[in-house]
Amino acid sequence: MAHEMMGGFFGHPPPPPATAAVGEEEDEVVEETEEGGHGGGVQGKLCARGHWRPAEDAKLKDLVAQYGPQNWNLIAEKLDGRSGKSCRLRWFNQLDPRINRRAFTEEEEERLMAAHRAYGNKWALIARLFPGRTDNAVKNHWHVLMARRHREQSGAFRRRKPSSSSASPAPAPAPPPPPQPVVALHHHHHRYSQQYSGYSGAAESDESASTCTTDLSLSSGSAAAAAAAAAAANIPCCFYQSTPRASSSSTAACRAPRVAAAADTVAFFPGAGYDFAAAPHAMAPAAASTFAPSARSAFSAPAGRGEPPGAVDQRGGAQATTDSHTIPFFDFLGVGAT
């Protein structure tokens, strides 16, 4: 009584689940139950899940031809280890003679792509649009089409990438800079000979005995022309204002900037507006004595190749011999005057 009251209070209990129709089975059936005998007893049957063997396929074809493609439980009784569902799927997907096994045409492929855009992955519904094609065949061929399209797109991208890079013009190289005139500064270090220094062994190691000259060379032709014109006019090519060497600190003049040396230098070159023909008449003896280099000058005119330092004075003529400006000699090393 109490049970009936509780049932009426909470409502009627849910109805028992309806029994499955004949010929339909669950997907994951491992043990299949069948009704047999007059007492309605239940008998269990173990089903195999392995691949279908050729002997099983041949026997299934014979049973379908004998019982028809609808009595799958009856057919499964004749196949040991196979269920009715397994026999049905094997028949409709692989063994049915109505299956179209030909390759998909271009028209069918276009219809398949359009149907997939419309219905998605509902392969059973799409297979109804292709008579003779199973849902598995339609699904597998759609994946084949997608893989083919992906390969074509990736291949076209790989072919287009090198062509686009090669089509771009390479940057033109920058033009070379215009040539600039080259001005070479030659630093010549001359040593006094024995007749000017008075000693031979110490002259080579004495740094103060060397003289520094800066030769501004524009071209070999202009230098040769200047030397020839100076020799014809009995005037040295370059005159240097002599500076008395009062102490050993005068060697710093060799290390001074070349600007200071150039300020004390008066140079004459051909073509600079100087009349070499009138030079001997125009120059006064005092000017000649002022600019004439002495034997102990801190700066000396560069001698020619293979000539002693006294060759410049010989070419200078009377200007070198009539040097009235006498420089006192200081014997710092104690070797004596010559």
UniProtKB/Swiss-Prot annotation:
The entry's localization annotation reads:
Nucleus
- Positions of the UniProt region annotated as Disordered: 1-25, 150-184, 298-322
Composition bias (Pro residues) maps to: 170-181
Q: What's the chief localization of this chain? A: nucleus
Ranges of the DNA-binding region feature = 72-94, 123-146
Its biological purpose is as follows: Transcription factor required for sugar partitioning from leaves to anthers during male reproductive development. Required for the production of functional pollen grains. Binds to the promoter of the anther-specific sugar transporter MST8 and regulates its expression. Regulates the expression of genes involved in sugar partitioning in flower, such as the sugar transporter SUT3, the invertase INV4, the UDP-glucose pyrophosphorylase UGP2 and the starch synthase WAXY.
What protein is this chain from?
Transcription factor CSA
